[in-house]
């Protein structure tokens, strides 16, 4: 009876371990699942999902554009940054501080930096690059008088950065949840080891007692 009881307890412990392990796998934070940046190429459009924690700083560094390219950063129908190639130095550069996120336009690389992001800053940040049908060697006299900006209508590249900002409170709660499951799983594993040891020891004693009884009867 003792051997059968220990075997049942061992099977029960194994079953509990399997259940806890399945729960633990499902409790892995969403942030860990999406920490990698998966590129989804759709012709000239690129989508880059990024997940960060609240309070982080995000920096999008991109290479400079040729002289006959123009580029713009947009978020929620608001143009954050813009560079027009026909103007000299900063004359063709625009930065709209009335837009919602705290950001800085990186003039040297035509990039974008988001500061101390919050959950409200989650969304799509799009960088549009256009080819302009205007020669690069336009004279200085005409650089400030270019009116045919409509010639910059050929889209070369459009990159959508899909930003998800997770709450720090959510991250702490999730990490605590995972740590709890890890602790329970470790405890069950220890219990299984103890039960296995007890089961093997009891079985050996039972066999030895049976053998001794047989020897005595003979």
Curated annotation (Swiss-Prot):
Gene3D superfamilies: Immunoglobulins
Subcellular location(s) of the protein: Virion membrane
Principal location: virion
Keyword Signal in record: yes
Membrane topology qualifier: Single-pass membrane protein
Entry keyword Membrane: yes
Cellular component per GO, a single term: membrane
Key words of the record: Late protein, Membrane, Signal, Transmembrane, Transmembrane helix, Viral envelope protein, Virion
Membrane-spanning segments: 178-198
Superkingdom as given in the UniProt entry: Viruses
Leader sequence segment: 1-27
Family: Belongs to the RL11 family.
Protein's name according to its UniProt entry: Glycoprotein UL1
Species, as recorded: Human cytomegalovirus (strain Merlin)
